[in-house]
Amino acid sequence: MSKSSEKSVLKSERIILGIDPGTTIMGFGLIKVENKKMSFIQMNELQLSKYKDHYVKLKLIFERTIELIDNYHPDEIAIEAPFFGKNVQSMLKLGRAQGVAMAAGLSREVPITEYLPKKIKMAITGNGNASKEQVARMLQSQLNIGKLPKNLDATDGLAAAVCHFYNSGKTEIGKSYTGWDAFVKQNPKKIR
């Protein structure tokens, strides 16, 4: 973990933005951490299915992520990393959506940590193969959330934030970036 990321982890009060990137629906959730206790701020989703142009979807993901950062001033972002699927085109689109959300965070110099879906599920439910419904119900219980959303992409975004809370302070919490310079330094082969 980088030094600036360590500083935010050690703060007694912080806000974590969790993002579940997608080109049909982007889910997101925010939690506040005070004195090592978390509380629910909000969760929602960005509906993108009505847009046919993939580039418009990417622009909207970027803009919504910037809007969330500017409105809530998160100290950290936790983002679900793409899982490996059989459909290469779907994987490319998902990777682009994740990259655009990460670029928005990096442009505002908010530290970002990626988590694999299994790690998020394990942190929330104790089962890396838990269903979306199981994750949602566990979050509902842990954060005293009233009614769950119809689509569970919002709870997936919230789960990324909660996973990051549970993993904060551990030495190996995932891939962390604190800005473009840190990203380039850690990924020299991705930049040409």
UniProtKB/Swiss-Prot annotation:
Keywords: Cytoplasm, DNA damage, DNA recombination, DNA repair, DNA-binding, Endonuclease, Hydrolase, Magnesium, Metal-binding, Nuclease. It is found in: Cytoplasm. The active site is at D20, E80, D153. One of its GO terms (cellular component) is Holliday junction resolvase complex. InterPro entries: RNaseH-like_sf (IPR012337), RNaseH_sf (IPR036397), X-over_junc_endoDNase_Mg_BS (IPR020563), X-over_junc_endoDNase_RuvC (IPR002176). Mg(2+) 1 binds at D20, D153. Mg(2+) 2 binds at E80. Binds 2 Mg(2+) ion per subunit. It comes from the Bacteria. GO terms for biological process: DNA recombination; DNA repair. Gene3D superfamilies: Ribonuclease H-like superfamily/Ribonuclease H. GO terms for molecular function: crossover junction DNA endonuclease activity; DNA binding; magnesium ion binding. The keyword DNA damage applies. It is an enzyme of class 3 (hydrolase). Its main location: cytoplasm. The RuvA-RuvB-RuvC complex processes Holliday junction (HJ) DNA during genetic recombination and DNA repair. Endonuclease that resolves HJ intermediates. Cleaves cruciform DNA by making single-stranded nicks across the HJ at symmetrical positions within the homologous arms, yielding a 5'-phosphate and a 3'-hydroxyl group; requires a central core of homology in the junction. The consensus cleavage sequence is 5'-(A/T)TT(C/G)-3'. Cleavage occurs on the 3'-side of the TT dinucleotide at the point of strand exchange. HAMAP family: RuvC. This is Crossover junction endodeoxyribonuclease RuvC. The lineage of its organism: Bacteria, Pseudomonadati, Bacteroidota, Flavobacteriia, Flavobacteriales.
